Amino acid sequence: MPVEKDLKTAYKALYDEKEPLKALHLYDEILKGSPTNLTALIFKAACLEKLYFGFSDWHSDATMENAKELLDKALMTAEGRGDRSKIGLVNFRYFVHFFNIKDYELAQSYFKKAKNLGYVDDTLPLWEDRLETKLNKKNKKQKDSTNKHTIKPVESIENRGDNNSSHSPISPLKIETAPQESPKFKIDWYQSSTSVTISLFTVNLPESKEQVNIYISPNDRRTLSISYQVPKSGSEFQYNAKLSHEVDPKAVSLKIFPKKLEITLSKIDSTQWKKLEEDILTESSRLSDEGKNSDSATRLLSAETASKERLSYPSSSKKKIDWSKLDIDEEADEEAGSADSFFQKLYAGADPDTKRAMMKSFIESNGTALSTDWEDVSKGTVKTSPPEGMEPKHW
């Protein structure tokens, strides 16, 4: 059927080619001829969500409102047909929608509805674990905030039991104000079999791509330097690193999001990187005032400090996969412009083969490998690949 072929083409554009705008136009064409096509309604909403979080021109309330309206129409259509599986799918997409805009309580209600309707997906355990983590963080913050604003009653002078007729003068209450922290510079990264993507989270962003200088040494193909002038202060932002493996100096792409830079590098080979950097040369934003000669040592982060900021490789525990280790802290989530950009890039909306490849490779390798290539993974058991200098133990 022509419509089925068009749906496959649009789905491929959205998830395989990573072109949500192209997919949006394709779904629009399908809906012109079939306004109640459930699949087109659901995934047109997904296109709008990806455009909202990935492109500044689409980052508006209207975009997300349109996505929600499409899901509303899809739900009405599915309920009208009595299609239980499609109703479950729409509820799952509602969950993703509200999760991404950080309404975790509402997201949880739709997640439960989807499960109760029998919706099945390989990523459900991962989403459930992620949702639980977010809710726990939110509840903890609310509890801490409540405790912080609790005022203890002051005991009156009459009730102190002090019989002295004279009292020492009462000193003015000194209120110590906690120093405000300077904006943090954080790093996140993930990889596929062909590329490595680095996210630099900072509030000091350039005005355009043209202002960013990205240099990869053609000699060792591992020395990376990223710099640009900060518009507001006139100071310079710099990130320098010695990558753990070689990349193509000529194949570099850059995207600027509301609170981060995203740099994608092409691998020379398909080696799975165990870490981003071999050693740390300089990892600092160098946001000192003009004319101020600060000690160069203050602009260097030690390997120990930087390692705390970077993300750990997923745990190999067979009982539970702690996917929260793949994420930076809550503040970085806020800066990313999405509820969970890193998790979203890896799992949200992946095609069925990619999902199967990721689940199979991670579980069979005991958490030491993560592949998106189903054609490769399906050929046999994925072997355990421990980090360099370590060996697997069989208990």
Swiss-Prot record:
Entries under Pfam families matching the protein: CS, SGS
Q: Name one GO molecular function term.
A: protein-folding chaperone binding
Do the record's keywords include Cell cycle? Answer: yes
CS domain mapped to chain residues:
182-277
**Which InterPro entries does the protein's record reference?**
CS_dom, HSP20-like_chaperone, SGS_dom, Sgt1-like, TPR-like_helical_dom_sf
Q: What is the effect of changing S371N?
A: In A364a; suppressor of the cdc35-1 allele
Note down the stretches annotated as region Disordered. 137-175, 373-395
A cellular component annotation (GO) from this entry: cytosol
Keyword Cell cycle listed? The answer is yes
| Alphabetic keyword roster | Cell cycle, Isopeptide bond, Phosphoprotein, Ubl conjugation, Ubl conjugation pathway
Q: Which residues carry this modification: Phosphoserine?
A: S168, S171
Q: Where is the signal peptide?
A: none
Domain (SGS): residue spans on this chain: 312-395
Tell me the residues linked by Glycyl lysine isopeptide (Lys-Gly) (interchain with G-Cter in ubiquitin): K32
Q: What's an example GO BP annotation here? A: kinetochore assembly
- UniProt effect for mutating D220V: In sgt1-5; induces arrest of cell division in G2/M
Q: How does it assemble?
A: Interacts with SKP1/CBF3D. Part of SCF E3 ubiquitin ligase complexes containing SKP1, CDC53, HRT1 and some F-box proteins. Interacts with CIR1/CDC35.
Recite the other comments: Present with 1340 molecules/cell in log phase SD medium.
Name the family the entry cites.
Belongs to the SGT1 family.
Q: What does this protein do?
A: Involved in ubiquitination and subsequent proteasomal degradation of target proteins. Required for both entry into S phase and kinetochore function. Also involved in cyclic AMP (cAMP) pathway, possibly by participating in the assembly or the conformational activation of specific multiprotein complexes.
Question: What is the designated name of this protein?
Answer: Protein SGT1
Could you tell me which species this protein originates from? Saccharomyces cerevisiae (strain ATCC 204508 / S288c)
Phylogenetic placement of the source organism:
Eukaryota, Fungi, Dikarya, Ascomycota, Saccharomycotina
